[in-house]
């Protein structure tokens, strides 16, 4: 699919390591957003879905449309052209990040292979892409609290218009440095420009405090 290629490298490494298990269980990992203007790309993702029992969307482009929606096309972007995989086919599990941590992807893939319900349920897509407000992600500027991306509210990146918890935050600035959309600035504590936020989850998964509190 369409993306910067970083998630593709991670997927390639995981597929190489777990090739036999993935093939045996018909598990496929897909990264990148779907370009609706590319007929072959749309056919490809539909064929992938048809031939797999489990489809895991890897990275923010695959899960939410990613930076293409905002950044390709410079000032205007193309939010209606580049869509998440789940807008075209059913997605079973979603791993957010721009790109996600490779060790985290491997941990989840192993859990899916081994049917470790305790781990995989946190990344299970709600039937499919069920939303809190009763509407899907169509507009790239839709408020993030309209959408619940996963079944685990603690890992959900769409549950609050103010993703920075000032009491929890140490002000280290890691999230600001990592944000691919330049939606974060820092003045003692990070500030979020919601209009620029692409809901990629990079800030969340790079936060040292979050990793300490939520991720094993």
From Swiss-Prot:
One of its GO terms (molecular function) is oxidoreductase activity. Residues 160-189, 188-216 form the 4Fe-4S ferredoxin-type domain. [4Fe-4S] cluster 2 binds at residues 179, 197, 200, 203. Keywords: 4Fe-4S, Electron transport, Iron, Iron-sulfur, Metal-binding, Oxidoreductase, Repeat, Transport. Belongs to the FrhG family. This is Uncharacterized protein MJ0726. Disulfide bonds: none annotated. PANTHER family: COENZYME F420-REDUCING HYDROGENASE, GAMMA SUBUNIT (PTHR42845), F420-NON-REDUCING HYDROGENASE VHU SUBUNIT G (PTHR42845:SF2). [4Fe-4S] cluster 1 binds at residues 169, 172, 175, 207.
């Amino acid at each position: 699919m369409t993306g910067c290629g970083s998630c593709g490298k991670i997927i390639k490494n995981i597929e190489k390591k777990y090739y036999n298990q993935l093939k045996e269980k018909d598990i496929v990992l897909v990264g990148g957003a779907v370009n609706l203007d590319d007929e072959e790309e749309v056919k490809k993702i539909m064929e992938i879905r048809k031939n797999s029992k489990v489809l895991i969307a890897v990275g923010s482009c695959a899960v939410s449309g990613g930076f293409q929606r905002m950044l390709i096309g410079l000032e205007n972007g193309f939010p209606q052209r580049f869509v998440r995989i789940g807008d075209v086919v059913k997605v079973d599990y979603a791993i957010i990040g721009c790109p996600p941590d490779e060790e985290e992807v491997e941990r989840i893939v192993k859990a899916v292979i081994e049917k470790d319900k305790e781990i995989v349920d946190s990344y299970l897509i709600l039937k499919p892409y069920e939303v809190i407000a009763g509407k899907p992600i169509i507009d790239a500027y839709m408020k993030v609290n309209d959408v619940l991306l996963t079944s685990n509210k603690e890992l959900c990146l769409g549950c609050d218009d103010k993703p920075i918890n000032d009491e929890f935050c140490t002000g280290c600035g890691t999230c600001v440095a990592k944000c691919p959309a330049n939606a974060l600035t820092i003045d003692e504590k990070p500030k979020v420009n919601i209009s620029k936020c692409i809901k990629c989850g990079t800030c969340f998964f790079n936060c040292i405090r979050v990793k300490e509190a939520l991720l094993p």
